[in-house]
Amino acid sequence: MTNVLFIKANGLPAERSVSVALYEIFLTEYKKSHPDDNVTELDLFEADLPYYDVTMMSGLHKEAAGETLSPEEKRLADIANSYLDQFLAADKIVMAFPLWNFSIPAQFLTYLFYLNQAGKTFKYTANGPVGLVADKKIALLNARGGIYSDGPMQSFEMSLSYVKNVLAHFGISEPEMVIVEGHNAKPDQAKDIISAGAKEAVELAKIF
């Protein structure tokens, strides 16, 4: 049985968020097209995601070195590792997220920090870091109200580009993508822009 992890990184309802609308459309079609797969949903705005602070970092580093952790270090390291274990157990992962203030929501950033662990998602070598989870199949559903694919705002796009770089660090270099952009910048075209993205999400879900 294929294990599929759906990650939603936006706390707004679908009627107010294009990335959440894409998530729900993709999820519905995926379940319809792959009825035998085991689907798990992770809502990062509802999840327990303690800030990636010095105590958590210390705990994870001590754990990797085989050292003794304090009770609080162990508690926080266990939380981070629980999300990492869930990620590692998935054969396919779908990530839906917006561009907010040129980047990603803080909850999503924290989650990705949890995943970024040497010896688990990547390893250090004499020739630099090498990803360890290249076998994962990933779909990215990204929405941004402005135009960032080209033009004067292109260099400000640090949402999709950041996530792609993190995944590349893990060895996942060619994720599937559905990108919806410009619906706020071009309100007269918003309906058509969003509709086109929704259709693209449906078609990808069928074959993902």
Curated annotation (Swiss-Prot):
Named cofactor requirement(s): FMN
Keywords: Flavoprotein, FMN, NAD, Oxidoreductase
Superkingdom field: Bacteria
SUPFAM superfamilies listed in its UniProt record: Flavoproteins (SSF52218)
Subunit field text: Homodimer.
Protein's job: Quinone reductase that provides resistance to thiol-specific stress caused by electrophilic quinones. Also exhibits azoreductase activity. Catalyzes the reductive cleavage of the azo bond in aromatic azo compounds to the corresponding amines.
Swiss-Prot/TrEMBL catalytic activity: 2 a quinone + NADH + H(+) = 2 a 1,4-benzosemiquinone + NAD(+); N,N-dimethyl-1,4-phenylenediamine + anthranilate + 2 NAD(+) = 2-(4-dimethylaminophenyl)diazenylbenzoate + 2 NADH + 2 H(+)
Native source species: Listeria monocytogenes serotype 4b (strain F2365)
Disulfide pattern: none
EC number: 1.6.5.-, 1.7.1.17
Protein name (database record): FMN-dependent NADH:quinone oxidoreductase 1
Residue numbers binding FMN: S17, V18, S19
UniProt key word Coiled coil: no
Key word Oxidoreductase present: yes
Enzyme superclass (EC): oxidoreductase
Comment on bound cofactor: Binds 1 FMN per subunit.
Gene behind the chain: azoR1
Entry's Gene Ontology molecular function annotations: electron transfer activity; FMN binding; oxidoreductase activity, acting on NAD(P)H as acceptor; oxidoreductase activity, acting on NAD(P)H, quinone or similar compound as acceptor
Protein family per UniProt: Belongs to the azoreductase type 1 family.
